Amino acid sequence: MALLDFFLSRKKSTANIAKERLQIIVAERRRGDCEPHYLPQLKRDILEVICKYVKIDPEMLSVKLDQKDDDISILELNVTLPESEAEEVHK
């Protein structure tokens, strides 16, 4: 029965395939364009301040900016702190 379904199934038209691909491309570009230009510098500044008090790897810091509505932006900051006291920076 599966073999019969395979031969009788309708193939997608090239127009539908192209439309789906364009929708994916547009969605990816929208997602990539929403990051403000200052976000990488903000991440570096936050990392610099945290490193004054605790020694962390730059990969342990995650900064994400979400746009909820036209007038609401949420800055999400995740920092994985070291477990041992020995890694703290004393000044």
Curated annotation (Swiss-Prot):
Keywords: Cell cycle, Cell division
Superkingdom, natural source: Bacteria
UniProt keyword Cell cycle, yes or no: yes
Record family assignment: Belongs to the MinE family.
Matches recorded under HAMAP family: MinE
Function as written in the Swiss-Prot or TrEMBL entry: Prevents the cell division inhibition by proteins MinC and MinD at internal division sites while permitting inhibition at polar sites. This ensures cell division at the proper site by restricting the formation of a division septum at the midpoint of the long axis of the cell.
Protein's name in the database: Cell division topological specificity factor
